Amino acid sequence: MILFCVFAFVKGYAQTGQDDTKVYKKRVLETTEIDFLTSYYSQDGDNAAVTGGVGTEELTDVTGTFVVSIPLNDDDVLTIDAGISAYTSASSSNIDPFDDGPADPFQASSGASSSDAWANLTGSYSHSSDDRNDIWSAKLAISSEYDYFSVGVGGTYSKLFNEKNTEVSVSGNVYLDTWNPIYPTELRPFGAEGNGLSDRLFTQNTITGNTDYNPRFSEFDSKGRNSYSLGFGFSQILHKNLQGSLALDFVQQDGLLSTPFQRVYFGDVADSFIDDFQLADAVERLPDSRFKVAAGGRLNWYINEVLTVRTFYRYYFDDWGINSHTASIELPIKITNKFKLYPSYRYYNQTAADYFNPYEGALSTDAFYTSDYDLSEYSANQYGFGVSYTDIFTKAHIWNYGLKSIDLKFYQYDRDTTFSSSIITAGFKFVLD
């Protein structure tokens, strides 16, 4: 039903625009296109940040996205991107591990934090000059989930010259985000309006180990997180079979960069438990600013009609002490005029952030601390395989929309920690007849 309504709306709008416009030059986008994208993602591991670097990281996520591109005239294109993501998470369920049966960091608990939905709506507009050598674009994005809201604006300018063999671009984005902080259950009684160990949680449960439980906790003053990015791009056709590109990106983040529900355990504080669950000594505390720089390049080599080689490398560093390298290769293989295969491989490694410590590695005297293994030192390998089907004549139809292409891909990702994940993606492109 949703798909039918989207098709109906776009068809009516597009036909009106096409009827009123006389075509004197090649359009940037010939006709309305609709992409439907979906994915299924799963992960697991034993270093959950929610439980201080130990415990299950099990999570599953299902997404669905519509991307509608509408030619407004010869030069202008409006694109609307609407998506939703629904996940269930054993690790985030342990924000409140005391709601159903014995508490254990390696077992999921039930409750509101065990699942959530993320929704996103992005609108973008692009304009191309008559000679197609200048392209301007702007976007507005809004996304929301239970404890987070984000609004963003951005723009890009691209210039082509040297008979369109060379392209330079500059882009900028601003995202203004707001947290609705959710803290681990056992820490909430120690907030500004809490009553400490007199809270119902502690009177109805028995604390073992260190019974004089006294965490280091205060609620965050700031709830905002702002991100500002500036990017530069350069692309050059080096040969009829070879194309290269370079990119340089800068990101500045300010505000609440800590995740309020991620626990930390101190090595110099005696452990306190309810059931098998260790009570938090604190929540993650990170600096309120972060500066990131990434520089990379791509080289695509068209070997022949059957095989293409796509390579990528990026170096990244920030002022939290992380340095990383990413290298990847993809080998599109043309099987027939309609089918292609896409084997790929990506390697990644990074150093640890200055503020990372494993379980009970931080001290209560530290100013900043986290046990989020995304900020740890690790290496990762990702293997992928995809298949695409393309029908330029769009023989298959849904209503007045022809099916132009189908893309299916699978990726397996493994770190040298206990973390691993996999994702299956599917994309379907339709064009208006």
What spans do the regions from the language model cover?
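Surface-exposed strand-loop-strand hairpins of Gram-negative outer-membrane beta-barrel proteins
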Residues: 40-63
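Transmembrane beta-barrel strands of outer-membrane/channel proteins
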Residues: 36-42, 80-84, 138-142, 153-155, ...
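Outer membrane beta-barrel transmembrane domains
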Residues: 99, 106-110, 251, 256-289, ...
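Short loop/turn motifs that connect adjacent beta-strands in outer-membrane beta-barrel proteins
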Residues: 16-32, 73-77, 130-133, 162-167, ...
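Residues on the lipid-exposed face of transmembrane beta-strands in outer-membrane beta-barrel proteins
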Residues: 66-70, 121-127, 155-159, 232-236, ...
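Outer-membrane beta-barrel translocator domains and adjoining extracellular loop/strand segments
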Residues: 21-22, 46-52, 81, 91-97, ...
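Outer-membrane beta-barrel translocator/channel fold
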Residues: 47-50, 55, 83-121, 167-240, ...
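Residues that define the transmembrane beta-barrel architecture of outer-membrane proteins
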Residues: 58-64, 115-121, 147-153, 224-230, ...
